[in-house]
Amino acid sequence: MAPKKAKKRIEGANSNVFSMFEQAQIQEFKEAFTIMDQNRDGFIDKADLRDTFAALGRLNVKNEEIDEMIKEAPGPINFTVFLTMFGEKLKGADPEETILNAFKVFDPEGKGLKSAYIKEMLMTQEGRFSQEEIDQMFAAFPPDVSGNLDYKNLVHVITHGEEKD
């Protein structure tokens, strides 16, 4: 009988987390989780984070930095824990700040995100964009001379509908 109670309590905890977001948001978080779960074992671990950073062009991430990220979780990071962590961070958050923080996870030093990687991700992940949609976005937000996307301006336009002055 004890296992049934434990199972119900766990299911209840999960449903609270899932009720914090709309279905479309949950799907977007699932896609982000899948991208980060590089070894496809259902958990995000140190190796997954290191591989994700490498895919974004950050090859020299310190072990301490990755350890700090992992320590934010109460245990192994499965999708429910991942969603809970984002839910806690997003409570009462400003939409512009929230989106910027999502980009900053992959650009903590503020050096920029390579537009080639962004293009690839937008075209290959679930809910993918067409080549025409990608071309339109990069026509409006061309990469800088280093090939980086000005995501701060992009986020401002997404949340405010106009470019920063």
Swiss-Prot record:
One of its GO terms (molecular function) is calcium ion binding. The N-terminus is blocked. N,N,N-trimethylalanine, found in other myosin light chains would not have been detected in the N-terminal tryptic peptide in PubMed:7319048 because it would remain trimethylated and ninhydrin negative after hydrolysis. GO terms for cellular component: cytoplasm; myofibril; myosin complex. The modification N,N,N-trimethylalanine is found at residue 2. SUPFAM superfamilies: EF-hand. GO terms for biological process: cardiac muscle contraction; heart development; muscle cell fate specification. Pfam families: EF-hand_7. Residues 24-59, 94-128, 129-164 form the EF-hand domain. Ca(2+) binds at residues 37, 39, 41, 48. Keywords: Calcium, Metal-binding, Methylation, Motor protein, Muscle protein, Myosin, Repeat. The keyword Metal-binding applies. The keyword Ubl conjugation does not apply. Myosin is a hexamer of 2 heavy chains and 4 light chains. This chain binds calcium. This is Myosin regulatory light chain 2A, cardiac muscle isoform. It comes from Gallus gallus (Chicken). The lineage of its organism: Eukaryota, Metazoa, Chordata, Craniata, Vertebrata.
